[in-house]
Amino acid sequence: MMAKLMITVMMVLLLSLQQGADGRSKRWRKNQMAASSIMRNLITARVDPPRFCNHKICYEDSECSQWCTAGCNSITSKCDTL
């Protein structure tokens, strides 16, 4: 888990360094938005999944599968959380 976090933080830093010549290019702005989205997901992924995700089959719903911090349970196909 720690290695995954380190890789993601490094990716966010690299995305933020890819600015255009003037620092305001469209590509730079897109990268900044993507980086902040990744960081927001990292921060929120540490809490419990939304209540509706507990009853869904996580393989069928990509929105819920990102909340499965311990992966999908192979028997019930529901979210396992740490």
From Swiss-Prot:
Alphabetically ordered keywords of this record: Disulfide bond, Gamma-carboxyglutamic acid, Hydroxylation, Secreted, Signal, Toxin
Tissues in which the UniProt entry reports expression: Expressed by the venom duct.
Name the domain of life this protein comes from. Answer: Eukaryota
* Positions of post-translational 4-hydroxyproline modification: 49-50
S-S bonds: 53-68, 58-72, 64-79
* 4-carboxyglutamate PTM sites in chain numbering: 60, 63
- Taking the first listed entry, what is the main subcellular location of this protein, grouped into a coarse class? secreted
Indicate where this protein resides in the cell. Answer: Secreted
Keyword Signal among UniProt keywords: yes
Instruction: Indicate the secretion signal residues.
Output: 1-23
Disulfide bond recorded as keyword: yes
Which residues does the propeptide include? 24-46
Q: Which GO terms describe its cellular component?
A: extracellular region
GO molecular function terms here? toxin activity
Q: What is known of its domains?
A: The cysteine framework is IX (C-C-C-C-C-C).
Q: Which family does it belong to?
A: Belongs to the Pg turripeptide superfamily.
Q: What is the protein named?
A: Turripeptide Gsp9.1
Task: Tell me the lineage of the source organism.
Answer: Eukaryota, Metazoa, Spiralia, Lophotrochozoa, Mollusca
